[in-house]
């Protein structure tokens, strides 16, 4: 498997849509890896509209010649004919292979690395975003070093919109998604990532506004029942508020909780007299609450969650016992059949992943999700 680095650009029509269609078409060649931000630059060397440009990687088993031909075919499918116009000109879609692994190649039809890359800031800046330490095989200079030395002073700005990774396409079939897992597993972070890439709005649990939460961590037995009741009521209200607020610009929702998490926590915090009453209240309220069609369950170890809790630094969480997290993990495992009867559930072990800081781990997580969506 080889890693190919590709630059993509357009300055005609709906520029971002041309970029997106080009990116989506490349998936026939292999798996898309990381994608840079989109940058905007004025046209250079001719009179034309500003360009949008980006860079991305693809893992492929195809040869360089086949990759190049397929890129040309994709350009042609979007109305670009390279042979008709020489020099700088307007382009519906431009796809250039920058690197194919560390291959150095010089043939009449293909030169690798791309011979003009070091002179083009619109290539180097997005490339540096996704591969700053990648070395040019000729002189061993990193992309960061090439960018720092680049004399191209063409104005460049970050475009307000991003390209959607094709890996999110299957998730877009679900207009209401929830993310679940124990405290500190990364639910809210993944919720925000999914919402941003799908163009959905978020429902984020309002734990910071709950006056009982700090008190509960100090005196669990005393404040367990009012805490669970307040969370249940707030989750119910948030779901209903979301269903009442029609947003013409955002077609779906990602929530960092499912309402039934109240049952998981209540089982671990309430006594034998309180829990049956709480169950009755939940059953009554949940009947009128909208349900997601997909739940993404993040399976995390208690030890890793404890580490994450320490990192995010919420003072009232710092003394959460690790055995309490272990009980929650066991409670969620027992709760999964309850969710599976009501929606599609994708359960992913993330104990070896850091999708918050590592883009490759995020892509790995999304691939795991897609595998299970395909199997359903």
Label every model-predicted segment.
Residues 262-331:
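A glycine- and Lys/Arg-enriched "phosphate-lid" helix/loop adjacent to the NTP-binding pocket
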Residues 226-290:
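Glycine-rich phosphate-binding loop used to anchor ATP phosphates in small-molecule kinases
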């Amino acid at each position: 498997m080889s890693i190919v680095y590709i630059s993509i650009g357009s300055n005609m029509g709906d520029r971002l849509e041309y970029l997106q269609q080009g990116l989506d078409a490349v998936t026939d060649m292999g798996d898309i890896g990381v994608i840079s931000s989109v940058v905007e630059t004025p046209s250079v060397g001719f009179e034309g509209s500003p360009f949008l440009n980006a860079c991305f990687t693809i893992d492929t088993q195809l040869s360089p010649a086949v990759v190049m031909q397929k890129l040309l075919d994709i350009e042609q499918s979007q109305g670009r004919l390279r042979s008709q116009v020489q020099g700088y000109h307007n382009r519906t879609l431009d796809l250039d292979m920058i690197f194919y692994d560390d291959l150095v190649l010089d043939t009449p039809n293909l030169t690798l690395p791309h011979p003009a890359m070091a002179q083009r800031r619109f290539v180097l800046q997005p490339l540096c975003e996704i591969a700053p330490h990648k070395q040019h095989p000729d002189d061993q200079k990193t992309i960061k070093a090439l960018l720092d030395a680049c004399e191209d002073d063409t104005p460049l700005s970050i475009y307000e919109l991003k390209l959607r990774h094709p890996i999110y396409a299957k998730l877009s079939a679900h207009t209401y998604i929830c993310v679940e897992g124990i405290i500190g597993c990364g639910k809210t972070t993944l919720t925000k990532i999914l919402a941003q890439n799908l163009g959905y709005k978020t429902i984020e649990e309002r734990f910071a506004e709950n006056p009982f939460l700090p008190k509960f961590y100090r005196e669990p037995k005393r404040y367990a029942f009012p805490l669970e009741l307040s969370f249940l009521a707030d989750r119910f209200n948030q779901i209903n508020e979301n269903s009442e607020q029609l947003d013409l610009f955002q077609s779906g929702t990602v929530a960092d909780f499912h309402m039934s998490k109240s049952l998981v926590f209540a089982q671990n915090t309430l006594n034998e007299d309180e829990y049956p009453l709480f169950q009755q209240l939940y059953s009554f309220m949940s009947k009128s609450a909208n349900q997601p069609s997909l739940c993404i369950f993040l399976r995390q170890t208690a030890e890793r969650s404890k580490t994450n809790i320490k990192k995010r630094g919420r003072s009232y969480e710092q003394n959460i016992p690790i055995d309490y997290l272990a009980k929650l993990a066991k409670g969620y495992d027992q709760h999964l059949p309850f969710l599976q009867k009501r929606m599609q559930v994708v359960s992913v072990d993330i104990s070896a992943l850091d999708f918050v800081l590592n883009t490759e781990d995020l892509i790995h997580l999304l691939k795991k999700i897609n595998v299970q969506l395909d199997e359903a």
